[in-house]
């Protein structure tokens, strides 16, 4: 076999694999977001698993507002405290209300499944892996897409998950959100806004926009969005506690492959020189 053939056999498949690594990561990232139904495109969410303050706030929000119904049965109290860099005694004092719970116990929730099914029509699901099968974009959009709907049992509906059986437990924080109509510019075929002979933008009424009534919530829009960010960030962590470590190691692996490729190329040149001598 000639040296050119050896080069093709050894290096082309290797370079092809290196090309696929970033491409595959793009596909994985795209798969994280799920469809958002009537909401349209899901809002973009960028998790930050090294922001421990965000994760700590998200854990506090989850335990105070969500854990009563939704368990995290694949997580352990002590592991969460350790990963979020909260001293175990402080974590248990402030976030664990059942003093019989131990650090090694699973976060199995406090609501019996049979009773909750009677109350809500369906047992609230465990949310340990919700970020894995729904996507972080979906969670972030869903928690901000509740609106008033008097035709529903709990008086609310959701654009991302129409007909949701879950009440808006964060209503007091967000405020009363409604669907409203707005005048929006008509878009021309060239992508610009249509204007009349006087240069005034032509508009049309469209409905389905979410708007919070002023003064009905404890938090401002920015504060509520920040709270939902922290909560979603925490759920991303819970879905894969080792995710930040995996991604960090992944960069080292890519760097190793690049160095290995460079060294292999230099080694090939040396072998090629010796081959030509003979």
What do these predicted regions represent?
Residues 14-25:
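Bacterial N-terminal signal peptides
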Residues 62-73, 231:
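The canonical Cys-X-X-Cys-His
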Residues 26-32:
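Sec/Tat signal peptide C-region and signal peptidase I cleavage site
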């Amino acid at each position: 076999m000639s040296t050119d053939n050896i080069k093709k056999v050894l290096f082309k498949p290797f370079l092809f694999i290196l090309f696929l690594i970033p491409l595959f990561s793009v596909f994985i990232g795209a798969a994280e977001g799920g469809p958002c139904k009537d909401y349209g495109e899901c809002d973009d969410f960028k998790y930050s698993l090294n922001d421990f303050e965000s994760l700590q706030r998200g854990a506090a929000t989850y335990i105070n507002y969500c854990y009563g119904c939704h368990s995290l049965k694949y997580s352990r109290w002590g592991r969460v405290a350790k990963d979020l860099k909260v001293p175990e005694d402080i974590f248990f004092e402030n976030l664990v209300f059942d003093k019989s719970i131990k650090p090694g116990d699973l976060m199995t929730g406090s609501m019996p499944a049979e009773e909750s099914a009677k109350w809500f029509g369906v047992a609230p699901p465990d949310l340990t892996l919700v970020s894995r099968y729904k996507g972080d974009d979906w969670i972030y959009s869903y928690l901000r897409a509740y609106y008033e709907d008097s035709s529903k049992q709990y008086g609310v509906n959701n654009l991302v998950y129409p007909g949701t059986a879950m009440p808006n437990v964060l209503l007091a924080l967000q405020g009363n959100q409604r669907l409203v109509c707005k005048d929006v510019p008509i878009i021309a075929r060239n992508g610009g806004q249509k204007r009349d002979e006087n240069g005034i933008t032509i508009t049309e009424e469209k409905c389905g926009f979410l708007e919070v009534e002023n003064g009905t919530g404890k938090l401002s829009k920015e504060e509520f969005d920040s709270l939902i960010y922290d909560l979603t960030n925490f759920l991303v962590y819970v879905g894969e506690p080792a995710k930040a470590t995996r991604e960090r190691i992944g960069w080292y692996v890519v760097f190793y492959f690049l160095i290995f490729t460079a060294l292999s190329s230099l080694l090939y040149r040396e072998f090629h020189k010796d081959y030509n001598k003979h």
